[in-house]
């Protein structure tokens, strides 16, 4: 299907400026189904023009941050690094995935533009190809260790435990030159079993301070399993499963009209109905600041209002905050969740109630529209 757009309509975009209002939940806020994350109040063409891009940004980063937060919970305090660049769906997705996962608690990223653009700490290790480019594995280890002071050596290209033995011999020789081997990385096989064997080899060789870093198709469930079995792993690289949000590749994130020409509107499609009017979400917590329930309403209530003004009459009214500030806020938000909602397994739904006034408006809208 082809759509012909008159030239005057295209020309009018040159002078188009956003003149409306935007309210949003602060980045890093824990949110639940049927809650508006962002609200745009503007002339229709201004509001429609930004629809697809807003959905694209909100949907993707909410998806990745949610998956990353689960990995952080499963790692239980051990560092988790974003290794997702090669598996994400495009370069921008990799950059935004690095940002969203850092916001949700990852320690850093291996995606260099994430540091350049957002100041995310950079981490990396050697590649299998680096080892294979040398005729001797030990030579590869020594070259990398001497040139990279913050080194972590990849030891599973050939034989993981044999490589750990080489690391022990190399470490003592390099120590005389003032070079320390900081860590080793295991990227394949039974990570827990390999980690136990490697830890024993390193400890017996006097390398108790050398850390073990694990990667390779890791997600929150594997992290939890490795923790449960007591695997001696000091940190993790997580790529594919977070960068693609493998087991939950989309959210039903939508952008719908709720008021036009001074009248409340709503969609009534089967399984896709929306609530009308300019709504607010209020959050209620107990004395320990753990979340109890949210209310979706048209009224002013005494809870904490989650939608805050960001743009008024086309101008920013909220000062920008740093990514690290949002990261700290996100951590506080996750800590305020009831313990049962921080578990990886199925848990009770968090209560989000709809106020009587909103239900009454919904009934009025249904009565007055056909």
Question: What are the functions of these language-model segments?
Answer:
Residues 21, 151, 210-212:
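Short active-site oxyanion
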Residues 123, 184, 212, 234-236:
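Hydrophobic residues within beta-strands of alpha/beta enzymes
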Residues 25:
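Active-site cofactor/substrate anionic-group-binding motifs, chiefly glycine-
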Residues 203-205, 210, 218-370:
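Gly/Ser/Thr/Ala-enriched C-terminal appendages of enzymes
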Residues 1, 66-70, 84, 342-349:
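Short coil/turn segments at secondary-structure boundaries
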Residues 13-19, 28-205, 220-222:
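Buried, small/hydrophobic-residue-enriched core segments of structured protein domains
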Residues 1-21:
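Translation machinery proteins
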């Amino acid at each position: 299907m082809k759509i012909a757009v008159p030239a005057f309509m295209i020309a009018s975009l040159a002078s188009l400026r956003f003149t409306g209002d935007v309210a949003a939940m602060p980045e890093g806020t824990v949110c639940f189904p049927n809650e508006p994350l962002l609200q745009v109040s503007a002339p229709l063409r201004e509001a429609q023009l930004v629809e697809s891009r807003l959905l694209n940004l909100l949907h993707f980063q909410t998806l990745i941050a949610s998956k990353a937060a689960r990995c952080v919970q499963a790692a239980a305090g051990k560092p988790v690094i974003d290794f997702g660049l090669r598996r994400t769906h495009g370069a921008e997705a990799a950059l935004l995935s690095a940002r969203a996962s850092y916001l949700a608690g990852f320690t850093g990223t291996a995606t260099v533009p994430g540091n350049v653009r957002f100041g995310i700490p950079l981490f990396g290790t050697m590649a299998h190809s680096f080892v294979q480019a040398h005729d001797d594995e030990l030579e590869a280890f020594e070259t990398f260790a001497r040139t990279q002071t913050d080194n972590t050596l990849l030891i599973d290209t050939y034989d993981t435990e044999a490589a750990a033995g080489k690391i022990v011999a190399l470490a003592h020789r390099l120590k005389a030159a003032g070079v320390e081997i900081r860590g080793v990385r295991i990227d394949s096989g039974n990570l827990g079993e390999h980690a136990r064997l490697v830890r024993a080899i390193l400890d017996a060789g006097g390398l108790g301070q050398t850390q073990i870093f694990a990667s390779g198709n890791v997600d929150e469930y594997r992290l939890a399993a490795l923790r449960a079995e007591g695997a001696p792993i000091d940190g993790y690289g997580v790529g594919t499963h977070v960068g693609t949000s493998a087991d939950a590749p989309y959210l039903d994130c939508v952008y719908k009209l709720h008021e036009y020409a001074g009248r409340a509107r709503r969609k009534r499609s089967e399984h896709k109905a929306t609530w009308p009017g300019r709504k607010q979400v209020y959050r209620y917590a107990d004395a320990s600041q753990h979340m109890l329930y949210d209310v979706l309403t048209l009224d002013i209530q005494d809870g904490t209002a989650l939608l805050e003004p960001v743009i008024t009459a086309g101008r920013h009214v909220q000062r920008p905050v740093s990514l690290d500030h949002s990261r700290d806020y996100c951590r506080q938000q996750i800590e305020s969740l009831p313990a049962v909602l921080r578990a990886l397994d199925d848990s009770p739904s968090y209560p989000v109630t709809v106020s009587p006034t909103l239900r009454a408006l919904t009934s009025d809208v249904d009565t007055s529209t056909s």
